[in-house]
């Protein structure tokens, strides 16, 4: 993970310091650097170093759930060894601030839980060559809230809910 963060920071610093870049691009680069630094502090405080991390595939295959195609672009792969078993999951880093209040926080928590579950489903389809897909190894790191949301150990209920939602979406949205 440190190599990924270091490469991203160097690229952003180049963009920020490039006189040919527009003020908007330079400002965006600086804000991205600030987010990366916040992420690093969060990663240290949340003890994310139980796993090793690798770059995800450049063009991950789409996930098709009951006729709905879902693009899944993780920020990293998580690789862990538990009791001699190589486990794999996907990592999503969320840096959005979002709204305050209990209702907004509940929606955010639910969305992060669904994202962690979708990451696990995607891993079961496309990452078995890297290890055994393991739901708790797929995580969403909510940087602004300094929270880790892991895929649930028992995924059956959440997967059934996602499948049902996709069935409804496929029935309602006309296909091209």
Region locations from a protein language model:
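Electrostatic, structured charged patches in enzyme active sites and in nucleic-acid/phosphate-binding
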Residues: 1-176
